[in-house]
């Protein structure tokens, strides 16, 4: 009986230590992210706040599947109303093109986070089925050009590389 109690006490101690160790590791990881690069944490929050740039991901995916990059002449009609605010736009938010949704999302993101959030969106599109090298290049090139397409002031085009993973 004493051996059984000793075994259970030892097992309980190991479980308690493992639980405390796991919790401490998670907390330290999150703190390290914010301390080493506070901008990265802020941009991650911006990305989540703006529904992970859903409209931008739709636009990027559509362009990559079509094998097109960025913005072309046939998109001119799509961008005519891009500058309209939601309340001025005759179409409801459900009917807006993914490009218009994307531009509206990007205008709401902090200027310092536009490129990091676009890179994150492009990475998610890439992970959701864009596997060919050409498709991956289209995904990241389209994402880089979106600030120009949406006429986001002071951003221009983003300078990031295609992520292999």
From Swiss-Prot:
Pfam families: Tryp_alpha_amyl
Species name: Arabidopsis thaliana
Keyword Metal-binding tagged: no
SMART domains: AAI (SM00499)
Propeptide: 21-37, 71-89
Signal peptide as annotated in the record: 1-20
Family of this protein: Belongs to the 2S seed storage albumins family.
Keyword field contains Flavoprotein: no
InterPro entries: Bifun_inhib/LTP/seed_sf, Bifunc_inhib/LTP/seed_store, Napin/2SS/CON
Name the UniProt record assigns to this protein: 2S seed storage protein 5
Gene3D superfamilies, alphabetized: Plant lipid-transfer and hydrophobic proteins
Task of the protein: This is a 2S seed storage protein.
Subunit structure: The mature protein consists of a small and a large chain linked by disulfide bonds.
MF terms in GO: nutrient reservoir activity
Keywords assigned: Disulfide bond, Seed storage protein, Signal, Storage protein
GO BP annotation list: pollen development
